[in-house]
Swiss-Prot record:
The active site is at residues 2-3, 59, 263. The gene is mutM. This is Formamidopyrimidine-DNA glycosylase. The keyword Ribosomal protein does not apply. Binds 1 zinc ion per subunit. It comes from Mycoplasmopsis pulmonis (strain UAB CTIP) (Mycoplasma pulmonis). InterPro entries: DNA_glyclase/AP_lyase_DNA-bd (IPR015886), DNA_glyclase_Znf_dom_DNA_BS (IPR015887), Formamido-pyr_DNA_Glyclase (IPR020629), FPG_cat (IPR012319), MutM-like_N-ter (IPR035937), Ribosomal_uS13-like_H2TH (IPR010979), Znf_DNA_glyclase/AP_lyase (IPR000214), Znf_FPG/IleRS (IPR010663). The lineage of its organism: Bacteria, Bacillati, Mycoplasmatota, Mycoplasmoidales, Metamycoplasmataceae. Monomer. SMART domains: Fapy_DNA_glyco, H2TH. A zinc finger (FPG-type) spans 239-273.
C-alpha cells in the first residue's frame, strides 16, 4: 500500500499535470470505487469544475476544486494514475475510471485489485465526516505532546500503534519497520511503556525517513509507481524491511521476519532488544 512518501509524490506529480485543468467528462468503469453516490452524480459534481490544487492528509489524496468542491482519492493497495496530453493510442489494463479535461488531456485511474476509493465532499465538511474525520496529522505536522499523550494511553504494541491512522497518519508497514529500527525499538514493545525520550526519537526518525523517501520518489516495492509508471528509489535504502536473512548494517546480526498482528514485520534481534526500549 502506498504510504505517506508515495502519496506525497503522486500529489506533486498530479499538481504538475492537472492543476488548473477543467473536468469535461468522467467515465466510471467500476462504480464500486465511487462511494455513497450514484456514478452519474459523481460525473455531474465534477464536470465544469477546475482543479485548484491537490494535497493530502496522510494517505488520502485531496483534490480542491472550484465552487468549494472536494474529491477524495485513496489508492489502497495499488491504485495508480496515468496522465496523457491527448487520447492515448492504447490504454493500460485495469482502468477503473478516466477523467477527461477540456484541453483534451486525460487522467486514468487503474488498479488490478480494485480496492481504491473516491468520495465527493464540500470544503465546509470534508474534515468533519468520514473518511477523513478521524485521520490524524502526519509525523511532520503533529506536535510532540499530542503524539506522546496518544502513545502513553495505548497498551498496544508500538508497531500496530504507528499504523493506526487516528494516532498519526501516513505510516504503513514499510516505514513502521524502518522507523522502529532507526529508534532501536522492538515492534512488540507496549506503546505506553516508552519514555518521552524514546517517543521523541520515534518522531524524529519518522520525519527524517519519510522526508528522505519523499525526496527519492518513495519505495517501489511490489507494484508502487507514481504518475505514468515512474518508480521510486527509496527501496534501495531500506535497512530492515524485506531484508529477512540479510546482515544488519549496524551489528551484522541477521534480520528476522515475524508475523505480528497480521503484518509481516522485519527487525534486528540484536539492535532491537525489548529490554533496551523502556
Amino acid at each position: 500500500m502506498p504510504e505517506l512518501p508515495e502519496v506525497r509524490v503522486v500529489c506533486k506529480s498530479l499538481n504538475e499535470k492537472v492543476q488548473n485543468l477543467v473536468f469535461k467528462k468522467v467515465e466510471i468503469f467500476n462504480p464500486k470505487l465511487f462511494k455513497e453516490y450514484d456514478p452519474s452524480y459523481f460525473q455531474e459534481f465534477l464536470i465544469g469544475e477546475k482543479i485548484l490544487k491537490i494535497s493530502n492528509l496522510g494517505k488520502n489524496i485531496i483534490y480542491f476544486l472550484t465552487n468549494n468542491k472536494i474529491m477524495l482519492s485513496h489508492l489502497r493497495m495499488e491504485g495508480k494514475y496515468s496522465f496523457y496530453e491527448q487520447k492515448p493510442k492504447e490504454t493500460l489494463k485495469h482502468i477503473q475510471a478516466i477523467f477527461y479535461f477540456e484541453n483534451g488531456s486525460e487522467l486514468h485511474y487503474r488498479e488490478s485489485r480494485p480496492f481504491g476509493t473516491f468520495h465527493i465532499r464540500y470544503l465546509n465538511n470534508y474534515l468533519k465526516i468520514d473518511p477523513l474525520a478521524k485521520v490524524a496529522q502526519s509525523p511532520g505536522e503533529i506536535d510532540f505532546e499530542t503524539f506522546y499523550n496518544r502513545l502513553s494511553k495505548k497498551a498496544l504494541a508500538i508497531k500496530p500503534t504507528l499504523l493506526d491512522q487516528s494516532i498519526v497518519s501516513g505510516i504503513g508497514n514499510i516505514y513502521a519497520d524502518e522507523i522502529l529500527f532507526a529508534s532501536k525499538i522492538h515492534p512488540a514493545t507496549p506503546s505506553n511503556l516508552l519514555s518521552k525520550d524514546k517517543v521523541k526519537e520515534i518522531l524524529k526518525n519518522a520525519i527524517e525517513i519519510l522526508d528522505k523517501s519523499t525526496e527519492l520518489g518513495g519505495s517501489s516495492i511490489n507494484s508502487y509507481e507514481s504518475l505514468n509508471k515512474k518508480e521510486g528509489q527509496y527501496q534501495n535504502f531500506l535497512k530492515v524491511h524485506t531484508k529477512k536473512g540479510e546482515f544488519c548494517i549496524k551489528c551484522s546480526s541477521k534480520i528476522e521476519k515475524i508475523k505480528f498482528k497480521g503484518r509481516g514485520t522485519y527487525f534486528c534481534p540484536t539492535c532491537q532488544k525489548q529490554k533496551d526500549f523502556i
